[in-house]
A protein has these predicted regions:
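ATP-dependent adenylation/nucleotidyltransferase module used to activate substrates
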Residues: 1-152
Length: 152
């Protein structure tokens, strides 16, 4: 069975990628088309665009996550597949209104992290895999809720 490490850019998933080799390492990036959030380094912006196969203007995550992922790829010595869904700006527009994520509607995780990961899996592998997702110990209830939603 093939293994996939889902990497968020955080410490837990970076630890998993560095210490638990997998057939694939995948990073789902939350993008924005807001020019006010433009990533400052033009060369890196182009490199990320090339990795995603989509124009990368900026991210709503900390800019350091981009450098962390590029460094992690070198550290583990294995390619990290970068995936992305619709930009945040498009997702929050629903029925002509802005719809922001909140405690009960955590669509950022499902639509901007998990869905692009599942889309990548279907295109690249499309068979049963062992998927490793890094949740911290204090996120157990969140992990259980996420698992329940993905099994629906």
């Amino acid at each position: 069975m093939k293994t996939v490490n889902s990497i968020s850019g955080g410490k837990t998933s970076a630890y998993i990628a560095a210490n638990y080799p997998a057939d694939y390492n995948v990073f789902a990036l939350v993008r924005t088309n807001d020019k006010n959030c433009m990533f400052p380094d033009k060369k890196i912006r182009q490199e990320v665009s090339d990795k995603l196969g989509n124009e990368f203007i900026g991210t709503l995550e900390m800019d350091t996550i981009i450098y962390t992922m590029l460094d992690l790829e070198q550290y583990i010595g294995k390619k990290i597949d970068w995936v992305t869904g619709k930009p945040f700006d498009e997702i929050i527009l629903r029925n002509g209104k802005k719809y922001l994520p909140n405690v009960t509607q955590r669509f950022c995780t499902s639509e901007m992290k998990l869905q692009p990961l599942f889309d990548w899996w279907k295109k690249e592998i499309n068979e049963v895999v062992e998927m490793r997702i890094g949740f911290r110990a204090n996120e157990q209830s969140r992990a259980k809720n996420m698992l329940a939603k993905t099994n629906e």
